[in-house]
UniProtKB/Swiss-Prot annotation:
Family note: Belongs to the transcriptional regulatory Rex family.
Xref: HAMAP family: Rex (MF_01131)
UniProt feature coiled coil, ranges: none
Domain of life: Bacteria
Assembly information from the UniProt record: Homodimer.
Gene3D superfamilies: NAD(P)-binding Rossmann-like Domain, Winged helix-like DNA-binding domain superfamily/Winged helix DNA-binding domain
Organism: Clostridium botulinum (strain Eklund 17B / Type B)
Full protein name: Redox-sensing transcriptional repressor Rex
GO CC terms in record: cytoplasm
Primary localization class, coarse: cytoplasm
Function statement: Modulates transcription in response to changes in cellular NADH/NAD(+) redox state.
Amino acid sequence: MDKNKNISMAVIKRLPKYHRYLNELMKNDVDRISSKELGEKIGFTASQIRQDLNCFGDFGQQGYGYNVKELYTQINSILGLDKEYNAVLIGAGNIGQAIANYTRFDKLGIMITAIFDANPKLIGIKIRDIEIRDIDELGSFLKSDSVDIGVICVPKKSAQRVSDELINGGIRGIWNFAPIDLAVPKDVKVENVHLSESVSTLIYQLHQQR
């Protein structure tokens, strides 16, 4: 993939869904699938799927469709999931613990190497054999260990400070669960997961049905 190619984030955000469904097809021993069949499964049009995939190359054959395993492997590579990424998790409350316990991350190549929190009652507790450390140790850890992703699960009032420390420590990817839009340099990539916004969208849809 040409990294300088201008591909919209809308296309990029659809790729994980293709990736997930193709993985399910492989588990069910499906060897090939047409764009029409794939679209029916995931709720996209066949034309949309072809346009998305054409951004990265020519994967299908007319009259044959897509080789499921080959397409899965290609999307896996496009998304960078064929590599490993070290992550640190800051905030070991309910959301943080749920993320730390999510075993699917290992299969995506994301390795949580350390967990930090400010609560003395949590420090020393282990989550999947990873001991929760004092947040004051974060800076020194980032200096001594290679980390790619910072996962922020702290309260809103602490999120920007934590983000700044992660960035100062060399991290260029932040997965933010705090209900705040972080101020970061242009070379730092942030993916926000604002739960209240997500559920508000659902509530709106339910409200429209009443």
